[in-house]
Amino acid sequence: IKNDISCTYFLDADYPNYLKHCIDGPILIFQKGNIDLNNRKIISVVGTRNVTSYGIAFCEKFISDVAPLNPIIVSGFAYGIDICIQREAVKNGLQTIGCLAHGLNQIYPKVHAKYQAEVLKNGGFYTEFWSTSNPERENFLKRNRIIAGVSEATVVVESAEKGGSLVT
């Protein structure tokens, strides 16, 4: 472990079970924080970057409704629905995992760096990208398959007709 980053190989016991069943799952996953995706219920939540008041209200109600089940909430730590759902999860004491489209040595968007410590208190971050990888456009679609692949269910809160959430 270097810089508090660990690596999980596809054949390791702690590699996410659901992700093992994805034909295009990554061979290696880098992680930071308290992450165990094999012993609890997991729900992925994704949506538009241009969140509306409806999306915010949905995130608040959804987390309030599922909190008694104590699931892990996975999202992309991006603008809009992603950060909204992750902040609600933290506020309600749920573990949350940010699945990133870049290396773990940075946070994108930078404005979300202030939430990184909140997530790391009871959750963490996942990525298939090396620490030096930047947030390239094509990485976001690659990341989406992991967001969906680690969970039992994926909830799309809001999305444009051709939004990236719909390929998750």
Feature-to-residue mapping (PLM):
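Glycine-biased, small-residue-rich flexible motifs in mid-sequence functional cores and linkers
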Residues: 3, 7-168
